[in-house]
């Protein structure tokens, strides 16, 4: 039910955002990290791109996403399609995110892409 989901998001996501920024502030104050990565649902939908230095998009084709959701979470194919229908289209992520990680080539290749992207990010600071 879209109305219930919208109400749930309106309740939870402002609190999630507050907690994310509370934790970021604590890490900054303690000088614990060279950079901070945040992974959360609805980052673009909630306007986080205005708060972070960079946004990354981890991409995998639809068939692989469905396969992983079915295997990892036990979802039906119908449930997978319902979830994906509520998400922003891939084009939006590709437009708004400065880095795209292709996650269909296996863990090793994904790790290499992330390592390269992190090194590139760190070279800027």
Where are these regions (language model features)?
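ATP-dependent NMP and nucleoside kinases share a basic, alpha-helical "lid"
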Residues: 21-72
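Short alpha-helical
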Residues: 3, 15, 43, 63-64, ...
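ATP-dependent small-molecule kinase phosphotransfer cores
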Residues: 1-34
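A general structural signal for well-ordered alpha-helical segments in protein cores
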Residues: 5, 17, 37, 62-66, ...
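Residue-level signature of catalytic and energy-coupling elements of molecular machines
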Residues: 8, 37, 101
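Small-molecule kinase domains that catalyze NTP-dependent phosphoryl transfer to phosphate-bearing small molecules
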Residues: 19-20, 49-51, 71, 75-122
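Amphipathic alpha-helical segments within well-ordered protein domains
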Residues: 9, 66-70, 81
